[in-house]
Structure formats: C-alpha cells, structure tokens
Amino acid sequence: ENLLPFKVYPLNFVSNEHQLVNIYNAVDIFVTPSLEENLPNTIMEAMACGIPCVGFNVGGIPEMIDHLHNGYVAQYKSSEDFANGIYWTLTEPDYPSLSEQACRKAISHYSENVVAKKYIDLYNKVTGRNA
C-alpha cells in the first residue's frame, strides 16, 4: 500500500543506459536515504543528468553534494532534516541553477577523463615518475 501523497512508479533492475538516463531525466530530484555510503554511483549518475540530490552527511556524500548549491546534505540520521532537504530542493526558486551546478560538478569531478587523470597522477606519484 502506498502511503505517500503522490503516485509511486516501482522500477525493476535497469541495465540499459538510455533507459536509465530517461528515468533520471523524468525526476525533479534524486534522494538517497542510505546511512552507509562511500561514493554512490547513483548520485554521480543523477548529477550528470542535471538532477539535484539529497543525502545524509555520511561517507563520500558530502564530497559529492555541495550543500545548497547542487543539492542538500542532511544531518546524519535526522529524518526531519532529510525531509527539509527534499522540500528545500523541490521549492528552491533557482532550481535551474541547482540543476546546472549538479551537472557541472559531475563533469568536473567524475567524468571519465578527470578520473583517469587522477589515477595516472596517483600512479606517477607512487612510482616516482613525472608524466
């Protein structure tokens, strides 16, 4: 039984990249209520589609979501603050800026080229090579 005040569309496992992008682009925000995360791919995927995100201040989430710039970082285990984050994100007058900042963050920090360069720099540092 759905106790939420809006329709819920359950999704099965999605492996098709185009279908996944369409799903992200059909939503206004992405929320992750997880209390244990490192670097969630789902946040990166949503941000790459320009979707502001809401998550708890745990693991790598606060490194990914810039509080009040591309989403909302709620106090750890505070369901009230988490709900406030969802409300704030949905009602933010400058939602287009949130969306743009989410996309920019994904590209500037998590794109394949950026991540590959970070790995190369790390390997060069560890091996004492200069590239």
Language model regions located:
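Aromatic "clamp/platform" in nucleotide-sugar-dependent glycosyltransferases that forms part
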Residues: 35
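Short acidic/histidine- and often glycine-rich active-site loop of Leloir-type glycosyltransferases
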Residues: 44, 58-73
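A short, well-ordered alpha-helix in the C-terminal region of glycosyltransferases
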Residues: 81, 94-109, 118-121
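Conserved acidic donor-binding segment of nucleotide-sugar-dependent glycosyltransferases
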Residues: 67-68, 72-79, 88-93
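Nucleotide-activated donor-binding/catalytic signature segment of Leloir-type glycosyltransferases, i.e.
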Residues: 1-14
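Short hydrophobic beta-strand element within catalytic cores of glycosyltransferases
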Residues: 52-55
